[in-house]
């Protein structure tokens, strides 16, 4: 009866649907392709990638997240791989390259099982179990406690992070900057620890000079000049007032019409405006400040009154800069000048000065007594160098912050991966569980590859070291990223924060699980151009 009927089309005709094993294997290929792009960026001998954006700008970096941000990919699985690098960067600030390499290897480890027609949920169950065991081992057996007061140990950990970057040549300077900045912005109150480096540790880049001139200012630096040329540009122990309102005549919120009949009406209007500005300036002068910062404008008349009172004014600050100055000098940001009181005035700053660096004027509020905000001043030969230095420094700042918030360490140089791999292997569970153990070895293997060592020999020797370890302590044998030799990380002093490693493993395994769960891709609801690949397999080739 229904034999001659047309098949029912549910999907649009220009929509392509792929499902089953083919999709899972394509997802794995896409993940591996992204991991291969990033692999050479791991370790102290990492190569740089030069990327050109659509606007013609050039980015040179070995930061996993920065590279993937610039690459344009089409395959949906590749896009989710890029997303995990961003998550890693936001959460812990370091380990972006490791997480991509590890996620790619976790996917590759699942490929043979899929080809043997093992169901993805079986693989996923084994991966989950392996992840739980890894996290348990890391927290109990493979990590050591760090004393935050031990500055030398803290410096070693940050140095290990910085050593793999472009800034590694100036590692001592970078470590000092990172630790100083984090120590400055650390706020401990009511048993709560807060380290907000994003808001209160601002990085200011000024082209010119040498990288060695970079430093941490115990205060705030902003790219502004005084509003009037005759105002003071150097004040010691200034009294600072911070405003969130304009020092100009305030116009009404709604539209108003004024009818002027005679000349005296016009004169009266001007007089009212003048009196208003005079009143707000009188409110400010009453608390005897030396310095006024406002986020809005300052009229010429207000400048005149403030100059007569010997007060320096700086206008149009960013909200974030105003908050930093408030934290640094102890002032309170005031919204209405009538409400200004003595306790709103900041007296914590030791020096205010305006300096000319290059062609621009910069305002410095420094030598603060108890600054809970700071500015990192970076100098360098070119914009590209400054941008890469800033990216590297952000990683160092995040590592220092992680140590303050969670002071536990694991051995670097692939030692912790090999130790975790051995612990999983000893459990003697067949199948995908063991595949996770082998996948972890990609980190020491890549470190050996990137410095030109004999990978097979190095890995076999490292495996033997870990297999023969029977003591209670952490087995800290790993690959020296500089030479490719096997060294004890206790001696070499290469440690990494536990928080970074935990996040790396969780993200990598969860991503592999997510991509293995996909068995259907419906793509292409809009018409494509003739030169674009239409199937996801072809898309995966487009990212390199």
Curated annotation (Swiss-Prot):
Residues 525-544 are annotated as: Disordered. GO terms for molecular function: ATP binding; ATP hydrolysis activity; ATP-dependent protein folding chaperone; unfolded protein binding. Keywords: ATP-binding, Chaperone, Cytoplasm, Disulfide bond, Nucleotide-binding. Belongs to the TCP-1 chaperonin family. It is found in: Cytoplasm. GO terms for biological process: lumen formation, open tracheal system; protein folding; terminal branching, open tracheal system. Its main location: cytoplasm. GO terms for cellular component: chaperonin-containing T-complex. This is T-complex protein 1 subunit gamma. It comes from Drosophila melanogaster (Fruit fly). Heterooligomeric complex of about 850 to 900 kDa that forms two stacked rings, 12 to 16 nm in diameter.
């Amino acid at each position: 009866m229904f034999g001659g009927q047309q098949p029912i089309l549910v999907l649009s005709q220009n929509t392509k649907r792929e499902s089953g094993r083919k999709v899972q294997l394509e997802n794995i290929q896409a993940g591996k392709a992204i991991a291969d792009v990033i692999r050479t960026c791991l370790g102290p001998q990492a190569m740089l990638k030069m990327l050109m954006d659509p606007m013609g700008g050039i980015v040179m970096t070995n930061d996993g997240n920065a590279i993937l941000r610039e690459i344009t990919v089409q395959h949906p699985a590749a896009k989710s791989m890029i997303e995990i690098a961003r998550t890693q960067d936001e959460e812990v600030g370091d380990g972006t390259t490791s997480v991509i390499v590890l996620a790619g290897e976790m996917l590759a480890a699942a490929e043979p099982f899929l080809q043997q027609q093992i169901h993805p949920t079986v693989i996923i169950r084994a991966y989950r179990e392996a992840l739980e065991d890894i996290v348990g081992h890391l927290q109990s057996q493979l990590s050591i406690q760090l004393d935050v007061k031990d500055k030398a140990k803290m410096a070693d950990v940050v140095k290990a992070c910085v050593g793999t970057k472009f800034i590694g040549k100036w590692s001592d300077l970078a470590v000092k900057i990172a630790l100083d900045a984090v120590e400055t912005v650390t706020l401990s109150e009511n048993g709560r620890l807060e380290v907000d480096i994003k808001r209160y540790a601002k990085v200011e880049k000024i082209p010119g000079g040498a990288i060695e001139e970079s430093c941490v200012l115990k205060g705030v630096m902003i790219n502004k000049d005084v509003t009037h040329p005759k105002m003071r540009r150097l004040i010691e122990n200034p009294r600072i007032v911070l405003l969130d309102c304009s020092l100009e005549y305030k116009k009404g919120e709604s539209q108003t019409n004024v009818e002027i009949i005679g000349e005296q009406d016009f004169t009266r209007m001007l007089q009212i405006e003048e009196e208003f500005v005079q009143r707000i300036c009188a409110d400010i002068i009453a608390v005897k400040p030396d310095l006024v910062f406002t986020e809005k404008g300052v009229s010429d008349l207000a400048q005149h009154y403030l100059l007569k009172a010997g007060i320096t004014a700086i206008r149009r600050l960013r909200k974030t800069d105003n908050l930093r100055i408030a934290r640094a000098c102890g002032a309170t940001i005031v919204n209405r000048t009538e409400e200004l009181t003595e306790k709103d005035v900041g007296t914590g700053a030791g020096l205010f000065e305006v300096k000319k660096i290059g062609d621009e004027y910069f305002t410095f509020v420094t030598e603060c007594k108890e600054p809970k905000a700071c500015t990192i001043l970076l100098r360098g030969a070119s914009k590209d160098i400054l941008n890469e230095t800033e990216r590297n420094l952000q990683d160092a700042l995040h590592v220092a912050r992680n140590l303050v918030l969670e002071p536990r360490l694991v051995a670097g140089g692939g030692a912790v991966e090999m130790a975790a791999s051995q612990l999983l292997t000893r459990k003697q569970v067949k199948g995908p569980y063991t595949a996770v153990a082998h996948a972890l070895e990609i980190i020491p293997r890549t470190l050996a590859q990137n410095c030109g060592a004999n990978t097979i020999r190095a890995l076999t020797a490292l495996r033997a070291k870990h297999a023969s370890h029977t003591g209670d302590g952490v087995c800290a044998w790993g690959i020296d990223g500089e030479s490719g030799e096997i060294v004890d990380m206790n001696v070499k002093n290469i440690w990494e924060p536990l928080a970074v490693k935990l996040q790396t493993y969780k993200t990598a395994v969860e991503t592999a699980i997510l991509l293995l769960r996909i068995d259907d891709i419906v793509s292409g609801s809009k018409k494509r151009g003739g030169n674009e690949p239409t199937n996801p397999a072809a898309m995966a080739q487009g990212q390199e």
